[in-house]
């Protein structure tokens, strides 16, 4: 076909006419993934996975490598952008009932777990103070596993403490896992397109579909432009906004930072971990804080898919959003009153959403039947 349109593939993709801007975050995540893979590749060329040289190699990248500062800052800020987009993407899925497409939701949650692991390994690589101590604290949680905990930890560390073998394997994992994410993303998208997207009303879109291009493709491009503009503005004017000041000092196993904390995007899980005084209990709660998302398709009892017409669940949803922000904030503070109490209360409220979901669905069904 001589004049075949370049976007014919997208022309042939029918999409519901009423999907809102909240549906744009999937394409934004794909862009973030491409950006992270490219900048990561250029950083890996100059990076040295050695405890004596890694910190210096980051300094070398930012000072001596042409545009190295740009690659390093784009990669660091891009990770934060990635998590902002993914949390909004998940929130949209919860609000509009996208989780009822089970395969898509479960593959997405698996993707989130792999992404969090990748980001954690990446945070350790600069071998700054916070990198080292965050790695020590988080990997040490494996010792809470009954019977095999200590052996598991030593196996991960490659010795009896965090050392050169740990950094080497973390770099190897940080390099290889993005390719797993790319593969999983392809599966995620294929599973989505077997059934198609949901929409804000939670109804079947088959009766009213429009071509993806030019309508939704232009909408996607607008949001991508906004995201990239925000990324470059942050990179140009305040590149260290998401960084911890402690991480500008080289790792020293003999000096413990006053307050150990991971990157901001893990603080909600870290806050939940910290709110339980028992080590094993905290580790279980940490894992549950993410894996509990997998229960959503199986605990949905309401006759309505979307929360658009469910005021009680809307209240619970916005409580969850506020709780998420509160846990993140409390986890940045020292382990002392009132922050410990705030952390414990918000952790309970976080899990309350998932417990109340089936109960409120059942109650709303009762109310709607009574009013008929």
Swiss-Prot record:
Annotated transmembrane regions: 25-45, 69-90, 105-125, 170-190, 218-238, 280-300, 312-332, 339-358
Topology class, membrane: Multi-pass membrane protein
Cofactor note: Binds 2 heme b groups non-covalently.
GO biological process entries: mitochondrial electron transport, ubiquinol to cytochrome c
Protein name: Cytochrome b
PANTHER family listed in its UniProt record: CYTOCHROME B
Gene Ontology molecular functions: metal ion binding; ubiquinol-cytochrome-c reductase activity
Recorded GO CC terms: mitochondrial inner membrane; respiratory chain complex III
Described purpose of this protein according to its UniProt entry: Component of the ubiquinol-cytochrome c reductase complex (complex III or cytochrome b-c1 complex) that is part of the mitochondrial respiratory chain. The b-c1 complex mediates electron transfer from ubiquinol to cytochrome c. Contributes to the generation of a proton gradient across the mitochondrial membrane that is then used for ATP synthesis.
Positions annotated to bind heme b b566: 89, 188
Family classification: Belongs to the cytochrome b family.
Cofactors named for this entry: heme b
Gene: MT-CYB
Keywords in alphabetical order: Electron transport, Heme, Iron, Membrane, Metal-binding, Mitochondrion, Mitochondrion inner membrane, Respiratory chain, Transmembrane, Transmembrane helix, Transport, Ubiquinone
Residues engaged in binding a ubiquinone: 193
Pfam family, one: Cytochrom_B_C
Record note on quaternary structure: The cytochrome bc1 complex contains 3 respiratory subunits (MT-CYB, CYC1 and UQCRFS1), 2 core proteins (UQCRC1 and UQCRC2) and probably 6 low-molecular weight proteins.
Record-linked InterPro entries: Cyt_b/b6_C, Cyt_b/b6_C_sf, Cyt_b/b6_N, Cytb/b6-like_sf, Cytochrome_b, Cytochrome_b_C_euk/bac, Cytochrome_b_N_euk/bac, Di-haem_cyt_TM
Additional remark text: Heme 1 (or BL or b562) is low-potential and absorbs at about 562 nm, and heme 2 (or BH or b566) is high-potential and absorbs at about 566 nm.
Record's keyword annotation contains Chaperone: no
């Amino acid at each position: 076909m001589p004049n075949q349109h370049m976007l014919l593939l997208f022309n042939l993709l029918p999409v519901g006419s009423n999907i809102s801007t909240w549906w744009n975050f999937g394409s934004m995540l794909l862009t973030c993934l491409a950006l992270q893979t490219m900048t990561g590749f250029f950083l890996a060329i100059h990076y040295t996975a050695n405890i004596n040289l890694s910190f210096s190699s980051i300094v070398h990248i930012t000072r001596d490598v042409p545009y190295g500062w740009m690659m390093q800052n784009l990669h660091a800020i891009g990770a934060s952008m990635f998590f902002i987009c993914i949390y909004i993407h998940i929130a949209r899925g919860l609000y509009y009932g996208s989780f009822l497409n089970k395969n898509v939701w479960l593959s997405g949650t698996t993707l989130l777990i792999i992404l969090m692991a990748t980001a954690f390994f990446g945070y350790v690589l600069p071998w700054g103070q916070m990198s080292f101590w965050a790695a020590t604290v988080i990997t040490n949680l494996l010792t809470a596993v009954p019977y095999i905990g200590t052996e598991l930890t030593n196996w991960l560390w490659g010795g009896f403490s965090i050392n050169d073998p740990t950094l080497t394997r973390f770099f190897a994992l940080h390099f290889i896992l993005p390719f797993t994410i790319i593969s999983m993303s392809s599966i995620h998208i294929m599973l989505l397109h077997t059934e198609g997207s949901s929409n804000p009303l939670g109804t079947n879109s088959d009766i009213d579909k429009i071509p993806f291009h030019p309508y939704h493709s232009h909408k996607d491009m607008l949001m991508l432009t906004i995201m990239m503009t925000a990324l470059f503005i942050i990179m140009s004017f305040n590149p260290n906004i998401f960084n911890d000041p402690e991480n500008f000092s080289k790792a020293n196993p003999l000096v413990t930072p006053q307050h150990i904390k991971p990157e901001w995007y893990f603080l909600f899980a870290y806050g939940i971990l910290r709110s339980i005084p028992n080590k094993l209990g905290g580790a279980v709660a940490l894992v549950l804080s993410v894996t509990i998302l997998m229960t959503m398709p199986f605990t949905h009892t309401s006759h309505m898919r979307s929360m658009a017409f469910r005021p009680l669940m809307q209240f619970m949803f916005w409580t969850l959003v506020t709780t998420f922000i509160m846990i993140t904030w409390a986890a940045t503070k020292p382990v002392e009153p009132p922050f410990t109490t705030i952390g414990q209360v918000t952790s309970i409220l976080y899990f309350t959403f998932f417990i109340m979901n089936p109960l409120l669905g059942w109650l709303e069904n009762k109310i709607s039947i009574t009013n008929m």
